[in-house]
Structure formats: structure tokens, C-alpha cells
Design a protein with these regions (language model features):
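Glycine-rich phosphate-binding active-site loops on the catalytic face of alpha/beta enzymes
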Residues: 57, 100-115, 231-245, 323-336
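Alpha-helix-loop-beta-strand connector modules within alpha/beta enzyme cores
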Residues: 66-87, 120-132, 194-202, 288-292
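N-terminal amphipathic alpha-helix/helix-capping segment at the start of soluble metabolic enzymes
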Residues: 1-33, 126, 290
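Conserved, mostly hydrophobic/aromatic
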Residues: 30, 86, 134, 178, ...
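Glycine-rich, proline-tolerant flexible connector loops at the mouths of alpha/beta enzymes
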Residues: 33-41, 52-76, 106-114, 176-185
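Catalytic alpha/beta core domains of metabolic enzymes, predominantly
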Residues: 136-137, 145-296, 300-303
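Hydrophobic or amphipathic alpha-helical targeting/insertion segments
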Residues: 92-133
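Active-site mouth loops of central-metabolism enzymes
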Residues: 25-43, 62-64, 81-89, 144-158, ...
């Protein structure tokens, strides 16, 4: 189900990361990052593949050492999706990552080094057709900006961003994506809104950094990124969670799906239950969700606890069930198509899902 009036999108310059387009009106790109030892190429590749299966269009991998660089070469060669090298402190590792096959670099203005080192990275990336994300972070700003007491945190993030974008573009390098991350949602909103106004042509990578554990991080990311995306701001996104990285892409896709920006797999519509509910709805909804998780068809599936929330309120669902005492009424777009016993609800609903997909 998409919005009848699509959300406005700021038209930024297109940047290509391997075969994936960021900006220029392309769909919002979903990213995540591995947490394995990059020197262990096979373990990292296993996680990259799991992230791709979970919905990542691009995956970022940290390259902190020379040993990691060797593993990174294998990862780039065998990955099913474009790989981004995350670089801090050592510009030579950035150059090595380009040579190893990185589709994009992420560098941090606060620790990459002086302009000569930055220029060496720009030149290497330019020669290889490798994109670069200028990844500004509130916790590691350049010292001269961090010490400015007359600036707010969002203003500091914007100042660092503008400085680096200008330097890159003055050098003729325009294959850039920009991020300005903080753990505060309010700071994130102010910074990205300002960047969208001040540097409207550069694609923006959205994220709330250090967002927290699964529940807290999901809430903060959904609020911060959802607001920005609803305003047409953002070309790619990463939901950061203190959790298995595979937990991140479904949250990102959920945000995009909630706004009607992208669809991936079924959307589950289920009620919170009340005194009218006469079945144990929670495990039914959970089982339906679990059994649908590997389906790719963009269907709307409703699991409702009573007739009030059934075919009427969920009439736009492709398929659904309205549960009553010991039974469930199956419906499609508001029309009853069958009645089943309570213990057969999930199997019957899944059979109808499979039938609908086969018919399509």
C-alpha cells in the first residue's frame, strides 16, 4: 500500500556505489555494517550475505589494520552487494581499500588527517571511480570546530560538512555522499535540515549514531529518520543498533514501508486487542509474522481480534482474518472468503497467501 500523494524528495546529485545509485531520485538505499573481524574474510562474508538477505543494498566493513585490508580484498571480490570501507585515522588504509576493490569509502573529517592526506585519498578514489562518504560525527569533530563555544552542536556538524564538501568539489571530486551523525534525535534533525538547505545537491546518508539497544535504537531511529524522510530529506540510511547487525535492515525497511517510500515483503496489520477479543491473538499474529518473514511479495495481511477490527477497519488488506470465539473469518479486501476453527487460522491464512501469490 503506497501513499496516494507520494512524499516529496529533494533531488540530489546521483552517486553510484557499484551498481547501486544513491540520490538523483533513486529509492532510499538501505545499509548496515558488519561487526566481525574483517581479517577473517569468510566470517565477514557470511555476515555480509546475511545482511544482504535481510535487505541491505550496500554493506559497510571496518578496515582498521593492514591485516583487515587483506581480508577486505577477498570480501570485495566475493560480496553479493557493494562494499564500503570504513576508515579512521590512517589515510593509507583508505588508499589500500580503494586498491582492494571498495565501491565506496567512509572517511571521518575529525581524524583522517591533514589536507595532503585527504587529497591523496581523493586522488586514489577518483582514479578508481570509488565514491566517498564524508562521515561527520558529533563525537569526533575537528578540534578547531569542536572548541567553538559560540556554535551549537548542529552548527558544528554543518560547518565541518561544508568545509569538506567545498574542499572535495574544489578539487574536482563530486562523487560524494554526506552524513552528519549524533546520538541526539534533535541534533540530528537540525543538522540534516540545515544540510539539505545549504548543500542541496549532495546526497545525504541518514543515521542516528550510537542509538542504543534494539528497542531504544529502533525508537530513536524511527523518530529521527522517519521525520527527515517524511520531509523529503535523505537518500540512504542506516539504522544503528547495539544488536546483531541483521536486526538493523528490517527496521530501516519498516520505516520506509511505513512512509510508502519502498516495499519489501508483506506488511502485517494487527490490532492491540481489547475486551472484545475472544482468542489468544498475540501468538497468532506472531506466528503469521514469523512465517511471512521470508516472503518478498508486497502484500498487506491483517490479523484482527474481533469483527469490529476485522473486514471493516482492515478492508484494504489483501488478506486477513477476523477472530471470534473459537474461530476466524478469512477475508480479502473486506469480503468474507471462509471460516475456520481457531487452531487452523494460521495454516488457513498462509494457504490463502500462497494461493494469492501464485495467482499473481
Amino acid at each position: 500500500m503506497s501513499l496516494s500523494h507520494p512524499l516529496p524528495r529533494e533531488l540530489t546529485r546521483p552517486v553510484y556505489v557499484g551498481g547501486v545509485q544513491i540520490g538523483g531520485g533513486a529509492p532510499v538505499v538501505v545499509q548496515s555494517m558488519t561487526c566481525t573481524d574483517t581479517a577473517d574474510a569468510q566470517a565477514t562474508l557470511a555476515q555480509v550475505r546475511a545482511l544482504a538477505q535481510a535487505g541491505c543494498d550496500i554493506v559497510r566493513v571496518s578496515v582498521p589494520t593492514e591485516a583487515a585490508l587483506e581480508g577486505f580484498r577477498t570480501i570485495c571480490a566475493e560480496s553479493p552487494v557493494p562494499i564500503v570501507a570504513d576508515i579512521h585515522f590512517n589515510h593509507k588504509l583508505a588508499i589500500g581499500a580503494v586498491e582492494a576493490g571498495a565501491a565506496k569509502l567512509r572517511i571521518n573529517p575529525g581524524n583522517i588527517g591533514d589536507w595532503a592526506k585527504v587529497d591523496a585519498v581523493i586522488d586514489a578514489a577518483g582514479a578508481a571511480g570509488c565514491a566517498i562518504r564524508i562521515g561527520v560525527n558529533a563525537g569526533s569533530l575537528e578540534q578547531d570546530i569542536a572548541e567553538r563555544d559560540d556554535l551549537t552542536q548542529p552548527e558544528k556538524l554543518v560547518m565541518s560538512s561544508e568545509r569538506f564538501v567545498k574542499h572535495f568539489e574544489d578539487r574536482g571530486f563530486t562523487n560524494i555522499v554526506l552524513s552528519a551523525k549524533a546520538h541526539s534525535v534533535a541534533t540530528t534533525l537540525d543538522a540534516y535540515r540545515a544540510l539539505s538547505r545549504e548543500i542541496p545537491h549532495v546526497p545525504l546518508h541518514l543515521g542516528v549514531t550510537e542509538a542504543g539497544t534494539k528497542l531504544q535504537g529502533t525508537i530513536k531511529s524511527s523518530v529521527g529518520l522517519g521525520i527527515l524522510l517524511s520531509e523529503g530529506i535523505g537518500d540512504t540510511m542506516r539504522v544503528s543498533l547495539t544488536a546483531d547487525p541483521v536486526e538493523e535492515p528490517p527496521v530501516a525497511w519498516g520505516i520506509l514501508q511505513s512512509l510508502g517510500l519502498r516495499r519489501r515483503g508483506p506488511e502485517i496489520v494487527s490490532c492491540p486487542t481489547c475486551a472484545r477479543c475472544q482468542v489468544n491473538l498475540i501468538p497468532i499474529a506472531e506466528e503469521v509474522t514469523e512465517r511471512l518473514k521470508n516472503y518478498s511479495a508486497p502484500l498487506s495481511i491483517a490479523v484482527m481480534g474481533c469483527a469490529v477490527n476485522g473486514p471493516g477497519e482492515a478492508s484494504d488488506a489483501d488478506l486477513g482474518v477476523a477472530c471470534g470465539r473459537g474461530q476466524g473469518l478469512l477475508f480479502s479486501h473486506g469480503q468474507i472468503i471462509g471460516k475456520v476453527a481457531e487452531d487452523q487460522i494460521v495454516d488457513a491464512l498462509m494457504a490463502e497467501v500462497d494461493k494469492l501469490i501464485e495467482e499473481k
